[in-house]
């Protein structure tokens, strides 16, 4: 229902409308921190939000696009130019949702139920939002309990990361931890904790992945810190059969998640 008290969508055509500036700020980390909101583009991602019982604060709809792709407090018809201005894309998706970020208190490690899922993913200091988004998508595909971001991580709710998740951001809980908090979690983890490293002592295919398994991965450039590596019960490697020395973060995460899923069937 709009400010007039009816269900007719509002319309915004002017690029100087204050709401355009307000939503454009959500492209920056500072803007998301201040507003505690994030953007999600496209009918597919918004359908995933609806399936996961999320409700948008705002739904912006381009001319000719369907309304009602996700439950929303307000629906606003906008021009393609307005969507371009907000998203920074030349060919934006015709749907743009604005969502409140999850309550931080519900996503701290104290709220994590280790036995609530057979596998979990911990990533230390991921920097690339596209890679992180792909990891979140793989976590969703393998029914992981959640993704724990350790240390100086990129923002999981940036428009680039949300885009890369293809809607999985709405299905996978995201937790944040300091390195010390992560070490404490691993020390009391009730199942197996498996670190990944090029010089791991065992091939990943030889691991039983006792549930609940925590998979612990570092970045391709820096690898996993010795502190987190030392806190894990196993250190596994992926065989490099060609000239490549490593695979990127998202590929490694996908391989290990599916290896754990297969072992735990």
Predicted segments, located by residue:
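Amphipathic alpha-helical repeat scaffolds
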Residues: 42, 127-135, 246-252
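N-terminal positively charged helical leader segments and presequences
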Residues: 1-90
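RNA substrate-binding interface of SAM-dependent RNA methyltransferases
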Residues: 7, 99, 103-104, 109-200
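Short, hydrophobic beta-strand segments that form beta-sheet elements in well-ordered domains
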Residues: 38-40, 57-63, 174, 192-197, ...
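Short beta->alpha connector loops at strand-helix junctions that form conserved
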Residues: 78-79, 124, 150-151, 173, ...
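Active-site/ligand-binding-proximal alpha/beta "capping" segment
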Residues: 194-242, 248
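Structured adenosyl-cofactor binding patch, chiefly the S-adenosyl-L-methionine
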Residues: 97, 138-142, 153-169, 226-265
């Amino acid at each position: 229902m709009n400010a007039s008290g009816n269900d007719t969508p509002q319309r915004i055509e002017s690029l100087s409308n204050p709401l355009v500036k307000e939503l454009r700020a959500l492209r920056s980390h500072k803007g998301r921190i201040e507003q505690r909101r994030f953007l999600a583009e496209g009918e597919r991602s918004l359908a995933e939000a609806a399936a996961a019982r999320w409700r948008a604060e705002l739904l912006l709809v381009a001319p000719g696009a369907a309304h009602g792709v996700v439950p929303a407090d307000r629906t606003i018809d906008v021009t393609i130019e307005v969507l371009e201005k907000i998203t920074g894309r030349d060919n934006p998706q015709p749907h743009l949702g604005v969502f409140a970020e999850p309550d931080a208190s519900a996503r701290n490690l104290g709220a994590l139920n280790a036995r609530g899922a057979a596998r979990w993913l911990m990533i230390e200091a991921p920097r690339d939002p596209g890679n992180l988004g792909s990891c979140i998508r793989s976590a969703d595909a393998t029914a992981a309990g959640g993704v724990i971001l350790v240390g100086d991580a990129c923002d999981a709710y940036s428009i680039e990361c949300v885009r890369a998740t293809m809607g999985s951001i709405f299905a996978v809980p995201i937790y944040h931890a300091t390195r010390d908090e992560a070490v404490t979690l691993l020390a009391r983890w009730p199942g197996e904790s498996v670190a990944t490293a090029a010089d791991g002592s065992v091939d990943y295919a030889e691991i039983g992945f006792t549930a609940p398994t925590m998979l612990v991965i570092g970045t391709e450039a820096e690898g996993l810190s010795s502190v987190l590596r030392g806190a894990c019960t196993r250190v596994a490697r992926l065989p490099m059969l060609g000239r490549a020395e490593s695979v990127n973060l998202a590929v490694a995460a996908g391989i290990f998640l599916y290896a754990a899923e297969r072992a735990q069937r």
